[in-house]
């Protein structure tokens, strides 16, 4: 891992200068195709026939937002917003296809799209389409929000854009503060403070970008990393789906702190103060691990809906949401961490 970090650090800088030639890649890993659920899912299941692609829980409005693609690659996607358990969810039709989802914790969701992003008010459903300067033909595939409010977007052609405005929901066009094109593809972004972590599935790597937009360290991430999530304690969780591991990183500097076997094609991730949550897509199981001792310790496990690709967690109520990627609904597990 060290040799990879040194090599990448020596060949990239803080501007948009690309590497000489395309980065070497492997076949990206993916979630397993889950069998039908063999056990009744824990908790309650709310219907959602769409094949969900991502989910976030917004603490400010106490709403769960679930992104689903359209019926065809070019068809507009939708955002389903779950609030009151006694009321039907709100379905927000998006202006176009969307590829990734994040939120600001204060009631606004941001979705990566072609040429820019969508900003959705989770309380009203109002949606704004924001274009990124000089990126009209760019397919944005990942999005995250920094602590200073700035959005970071990743693209299908391997670039990371840090936007200039600290209020991304209040602009109609977004200028770019920095751009780094050093990846094969940007599949996932996460942030800790104003540091951005980039996951490239084809390179099965994680890379940090600092607050000024400078590329910092890079490390290999197992044999086939697929998903990534940040937690409230400064850690970044990565699912090595092909290698069957949970990887836990610190970001300042980037360092692999824990690697623990998780079989059955781990994929869905959610961080929390108490436990790190990982879903197993082969077996339709979600597991909560305590990371506090330095070696992950399994504390709880629950049977899930089929294809548990997306997880979200509500710290205030200790509620875990497991969102099916096959149309089997949204599973709600109250008091998920239990007594510890």
Model-inferred region functions:
Residues 1-6:
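Sec-dependent N-terminal signal peptides
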Residues 8-10, 14-340:
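Predominantly soluble domains enriched in secretory-pathway, periplasmic, or organellar proteins
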